[in-house]
Amino acid sequence: MTNIRKTHPLLKIVNHSLIDLPAPSNISAWWNFGSLLGLCLLIQILTGLFLAMHYTSDTATAFSSVTHICRDVNYGWLIRYLHANGASMFFICLYMHVGRGIYYGSYTYLETWNIGIILLFAVMATAFMGYVLPWGQMSFWGATVITNLLSAIPYIGTTLVEWIWGGFSVDKATLTRFFAFHFILPFIIAALVMIHLLFLHETGSNNPSGIPSDSDKIPFHPYYTIKDLLGFLSLILLLLLLVLFSPDLLGDPDNYTPANPLNTPPHIKPEWYFLFAYAILRSIPNKLGGVLALVMSILILAIIPLLHMSKQRSMMFRPVSQALFWVLVADLLTLTWIGGQPVEHPFITIGQVASVLYFSIILILMPLASLIENKILKW
């Protein structure tokens, strides 16, 4: 009799995705981040569900309901900090995953890559709206500043902002709708993840060499199930270290002050994972220009496949491109640092230089390096 996992309509899908899936024999730890993102999403949905049981999305009670969760609910503090720091782990894995895609040329799987970009936008939107929910000072002012950016859109801007706010400022209506969206989006993300995997399994995984590996495949189980499990344990260990020893390390102390529309915090800044984009936004002294640069800082990922000039897929054997890639990483770290600094000399100039460099590397220097490397191949 044939094994049930190969015949049952539902188990067959699981089998072809997680058990008998042919996988390249040489994929490194950089290929662990996809499954880690799945784990992060699961952690966020579960902790978020339990938080939603005790949270109230009303301006009068939102802040105190979060306090109530931390003080009075059994292990509420643990659930809350797992959720808050889980978001940080989510973004660490996301950026590593995208970086891996750029380094090893995984963006040549166009459908998978484009769904991935949509996923990135969806996760960023979810994280932003989640940050508003505790209704602290940084929640309120962060929401005010970021939603206000839409007013830079010509003609419809102001109307659009008031429509999103549900009034003439960030208030009750805004908080309630942000909670609704924050609750529904992770499930939409989960559906998009399924599509992401569907497209990936059409082509199979890429590998570090960038060379087709059809002649050398191994079954996903047990080789990569055990490898993913090791990744899971590492991620959970790191998350628990963060949650149990320094839960507020990555947060802003201003968010422990209840939201007050009459008192602006001296430095309005988003969570650390948005600082690089925030720095790019602030580098341009024009509102609409800044907003366009902000959107393009992520949307530029969609252009990367079009700029692939190399005869090789991966950067594994391309030292010039490798050097540029790591300069790009350093540049993003610089932007992250600048995003958290006040708008004054010398930070303004550093931010502007780093922003120009960010776009230059991706749009100009990397394609040029690829062409140079193609020439070197002929020597």
From Swiss-Prot:
One of its GO terms (biological process) is mitochondrial electron transport, ubiquinol to cytochrome c. Belongs to the cytochrome b family. Its main location: mitochondrion. Binds 2 heme b groups non-covalently. It is a multi-pass membrane protein. This is Cytochrome b. It comes from Lepus brachyurus. The gene is MT-CYB. Its cofactor is heme b.
